[in-house]
Amino acid sequence: MARFDIVLLIGLCLIISVFPDTTTAQLSRGFYSKTCPNVEQIVRNAVQKKIKKTFVAVPATLRLFFHDCFVNGCDASVMIQSTPKNKAEKDHPDNISLAGDGFDVVIQAKKALDSNPSCRNKVSCADILTLATRDVVVAAGGPSYEVELGRFDGLVSTASSVEGNLPGPSDNVDKLNALFTKNKLTQEDMIALSAAHTLGFAHCGKVFKRIHKFNGINSVDPTLNKAYAIELQKACPKNVDPRIAINMDPVTPKTFDNTYFKNLQQGKGLFTSDQVLFTDGRSRPTVNAWASNSTAFNRAFVIAMTKLGRVGVKNSSNGNIRRDCGAFN
């Protein structure tokens, strides 16, 4: 499990603190120190219980956090269930594949918090998701880091708001940079956060074109490692159920590490949006650097996750603390 020494942790705190933002001024590491002082331990225990039941909870929670923050900010709006009068974010086609185990991590942590009288209805679902995301990263061997707290839960969740706001598996670096820039994230942040694909799985439907019908000249994307392409074709043959799952990282799918970048160097990025990070000269130097230096990657990932957690934060004037993470109060 990755560990940072004290000097590195202090350095990260200093780097992160130099980016004050009026929209995130309310965030602090001790936000619940008086109202729910054991919030982190309670959430961590709930996360660990869930992971013991299924490892899917790890990548599912990490992906859920990203999808939440990139659509109207980190406000747990992705948790909201649709109603006859409103189609919520989670039911947009780009979110349909979000695994239920990620949602359940938040639900179980919320139950654990509410069973503590001093914490009942004190901690936002947005903060629960943020804490749980850090905890699943650590559980998979990734870096531990301090989490800023104080988010309020969003009051709006619509499927239409998702459209065009999430990266796609065929995106190039220009498209990726544009999406991340919109959320005040740099190219380096984008590359670091893309490495979340070191965990979990994707569905055959997302890679079918790349391995069977790439274009009029090549049936297989020529940037794919040939042996890896054959493996993918065997796992996802023509006419296969598009819901069949395949590992994002063919080498260490259950470990958070920098193998993701080593895979890209070998042409083993599952999505086009992964492999372009190596084939594009603008991002290749960073991929090469982090492939050979896990400490540098971990440092960049912590910074990127902290910045991501500041996107679109709600306060008491445009948010609240939900009693049920899946429904508005």
Swiss-Prot record:
InterPro entries listed in its UniProt record: Haem_peroxidase, Haem_peroxidase_sf, Peroxidase_pln, Peroxidases_AS, Peroxidases_heam-ligand_BS, Secretory_peroxidase
An example Gene Ontology molecular-function term: heme binding
Catalytic reaction equation(s): 2 a phenolic donor + H2O2 = 2 a phenolic radical donor + 2 H2O
Residue(s) at site: Transition state stabilizer: R63
Signal sequence annotation: 1-25
Domain of life: Eukaryota
Compartments in which it is found: Secreted
Binding positions for Ca(2+) 1 per the UniProt entry: D68, V71, G73, D75, S77
Leftover remarks: There are 73 peroxidase genes in A.thaliana.
Role summary: Removal of H(2)O(2), oxidation of toxic reductants, biosynthesis and degradation of lignin, suberization, auxin catabolism, response to environmental stresses such as wounding, pathogen attack and oxidative stress. These functions might be dependent on each isozyme/isoform in each plant tissue.
Protein name: Peroxidase 35
Native species: Arabidopsis thaliana
